[in-house]
Structure formats: C-alpha cells, structure tokens
A protein has these predicted regions:
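Hydrophobic helical membrane-anchoring modules
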Residues: 1-4, 19, 26-27, 149-151, ...
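Conserved short acidic donor-positioning loop in nucleotide-sugar-dependent glycosyltransferases
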Residues: 16, 41-45, 69, 78
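A conserved acidic beta->alpha catalytic loop
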Residues: 40-51, 99
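Short beta-strand-to-loop acidic/aromatic patch adjacent to the donor-nucleotide binding site
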Residues: 86-100
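Acceptor/aglycone-binding surface of glycosyltransferases and processive sugar-polymer synthases
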Residues: 66-69, 73-81, 103-180, 207-215, ...
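A conserved hydrophobic helix/loop-capping motif in glycosyltransferases and polysaccharide synthases
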Residues: 8-17, 24, 31
C-alpha cells in the first residue's frame, strides 16, 4: 500500500457533481485511501445522491455547506476538518472531482510530498500537448507570465492537485479568498512566507470539454490576473 494512502487526507470540494465524481471516489477507495474529506459546497437536491453514496463508505467524511460558499471556502473548511479529525495525518492532497486528476498522479504527488517533507507539491499539466482547449492554453500562459513578474516560475498556475504538508494547513486556512482566487492567493502567500514548492508532472486530461468543472478559463484567468496586478502594486 502506498504511504500517502494512509498518511494523507484527501480534500475534495464539490458543487453539483456528476458521475465523474463517483468514478474519482471509486479510484481513491480502490487505491486504499483511508481518509477522504468531501465538502459539498451547496449542491442542489438533484445532485445529493452522489454525496449520499459517499457517506456509505467509512473512509469518507462529507461536510455540507448551506449554500454555495466557493471553492476557497470549501478548501479551507476541508483543511480545518483534516486537522481536527485526523491528528496523525502528515498532510492533505487537494483534488477536483471532475476526473482531471488521475489516481496514480494523486498518489505520486502525495508520496513526493511525504519524501520532501517541507515542500508543497503541485501536480502540473502539459499545456503544449495536442487536444488541450485553446482557452485553457491562453489562460495558463497569461497567468504564468504574471506569476513570473512576482518571482514565481510555475508551469500550471491553475492546478487543483496540491499535496500540502500538515505544518502549513493552519496558515493556509487564514489566506484570503473564498472562491477560485483563493488558490492564487495561496501561491502568493507561499512566496511571501518562504514556503517552497515542487512541480510533479501529471497527465493532461480534458474530456468532453471538462463538463463538470466550474472553472471558467477566460473569466477566472482574468480574475487571477487582476489579483496578480494588485499584489505587484502592493509590493512596490
């Protein structure tokens, strides 16, 4: 059994999931993950069957939000739950439930984090491969350039697959932002706090135009760019 399946907590935020969510969960369980925190971020009644199914597995804890609070809030609540419920866990692995993150890549990121101990491990896709939607390529290139201005060289600025050592979780719970901007703010705070990161290459998965993902490559990339401009202005 892989180390991270016992020593790490999966944190999975979800809003109105589809069957891809069930397949992701099945993959985690088949791999032997013992601790899975799922945050239902205000999903409607039509999608509750997926969370009801998750609750039947002893490895899963489902935290409901009364109304949509945003991915950032869901992640922070997931971190808090991991700290409180699993005191022996050595870190968390954040993933998305839309099928973009393959089980073997989740394990690779988790195990690398356990080996490196103090580095956040980011699962990074290759946007130069054929078949990647043009808007995703453009959005990532734009935000990558902005991160370089801040002194952060990162090939996949929008990755939701992140393996985080336990010692950083309390601080990450204090990072501003309740929606997609939170993940950008986390990277900026890592730079400010001197927290290092490693990039772990992962499979680049885009199926059915990523139906099930709530990330808008154009709109949310623009939001990230505005955050970066504000950060650069405040730093100067």
């Amino acid at each position: 059994m892989n180390d991270c399946t016992e020593r790490c907590v999966i944190v999975l935020p979800s809003l109105n999931p589809n069957e891809k969510f069930d397949r992701v969960l099945d993959g985690l369980l088949e791999a032997g993950f013992q601790h899975i925190v799922i945050v239902d971020d205000g999903s409607d009644a039509a999608h509750q069957k997926h969370f009801a199914r998750a609750r039947t597995f002893p490895e899963c804890v489902v935290i409901p939000h009364l109304g949509n609070k945003g991915k950032g809030r869901a992640l922070k609540d997931g971190f808090a739950a991991a700290l409180a419920r699993f005191p022996e866990a050595e870190g968390v692995i954040t993933i998305d439930g839309d099928g973009q993150h393959l089980t073997q890549d989740i394990i690779a990121c988790g195990n690398r984090m356990l080996e490196e101990k103090t580095q956040v491990v980011l699962g990074c896709r290759n946007f130069d491969l054929p078949g990647v939607p043009a808007r995703s390529v453009a959005g990532n290139k734009t935000t990558s350039r902005m991160f370089r201005l801040y002194g952060i060289k990162l090939s996949d600025t929008q990755t939701g697959l992140r393996a985080i050592p336990r010692q950083y979780l309390q601080r990450f719970c204090s990072v501003a932002g309740d929606r997609f901007e939170y993940e950008t703010n986390m990277l900026l705070k890592m730079k400010q706090w001197g927290i290092g990161f490693s990039e772990q290459p992962i499979e680049t998965v885009y199926e059915d135009e990523n139906v099930g993902s709530h990330y808008n490559a154009v709109k949310d990339s623009w939001r990230i760019t505005k955050i970066m401009f504000r950060a650069l202005f405040n730093r100067s």
